[in-house]
């Protein structure tokens, strides 16, 4: 038996399987057979193939039959779903759904070849198809519509690690985070016709639907527990801050929760018209506070569609020289900014060393620049609200907790479109409220 390996040439790749079988993948524009297969796949997906499968799994679950699916293959699919966290796993689940759809619609199409084009400037396999186009137009929109996966609207195939110019196999070397080995095993099983693709697709969709139902029940329970907590407690700034801090520090991916907590407080302030002439910008996706997205910070207030106030959350980071220089570059293209700042989870280090540069930036751009801890920032916002006399401390503290909980419960997607999976965060918050 050979060891599975990939041979790469200037115009082709050759995947050598353990039994000596060689699969040839010629590079170049899509051939006529690939175009015909691709058209068939597009027609099926554009006329609702995936949506029909989702609705069948949701509305006729008693008619589902998974007897043809082995325990080993069920395990692979279960592990894919279980691997999804707020940081990893979503792209591989989305890709698995896409590959199963493709194979169910057109069994002759290889699901290893994820790029296909007629344009000579683009990399393409002659037998490949554009999985990125299929994802963006047909897969991600359906998964988002039925809340099966929290995905960016651009689609999971925009993930760089899925776009290498090599066929998908166990020797695909990109750094894919999540249940990589399970996904690889699934690809091999599909290509060997060891699974019936439509049955596997329905099983995977059923597991995602179960998870979605569980989330909705947990969201309702957490909101009910918060209501009971607020009725039984005379709430103030300290109590709400303590509860939210405890939740952040006991949860995974605390940096993202700190952003959500800050944005939630601003939501509460907006509800009480603390800044009546400004508009809170909807929460951005994780890691999007950069020049490419036109952001200055994680939290932004707009006036006449221009950013006038921005705060950037820095969890676990206390020395901010690089961040200050990045802010200076961003301010050059955002002349309307009047206040900007960094909010740290730790006390800022070597602040005396940074102050001259901060003062210089204030002078150049005519802004107020602040570096404060999360606790100090919360105090500033409460003081700001009380000075406006639009809400009492108790009202704002309660509204903050409500906004934070409802944001995580996916009840505020217009202002807080959180695409991170929130189940574990919500579970921990529910536990925290129950203890309180």
Residue ranges and their predicted role:
Residues 32-41, 60, 141-150, 195-211, ...:
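Charged, low-complexity, helix/coiled-coil-prone segments
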Residues 1-191:
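Terminal, charged accessory segments of proteins
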Residues 3, 7-8, 249, 260-436:
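Catalytic core segments in nucleotide and nucleic-acid processing enzymes
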Residues 74-81, 140, 180, 184-191, ...:
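Generic detector of well-ordered alpha-helical segments enriched in charged/polar residues
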Residues 30, 50-51, 159-163, 236-243, ...:
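Short amphipathic alpha-helical segments, especially helix-boundary/capping motifs
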Residues 88-92, 213-220, 274, 416, ...:
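Residue-level signal for secondary-structure boundary elements
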Residues 33-39, 48-66, 202-206, 210, ...:
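N-terminal/domain-start segments enriched in small and hydrophobic, helix-friendly residues
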Residues 154, 162-287:
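The feature marks a conserved, polyanion-engaging helical scaffold used by nucleic-acid processing enzymes
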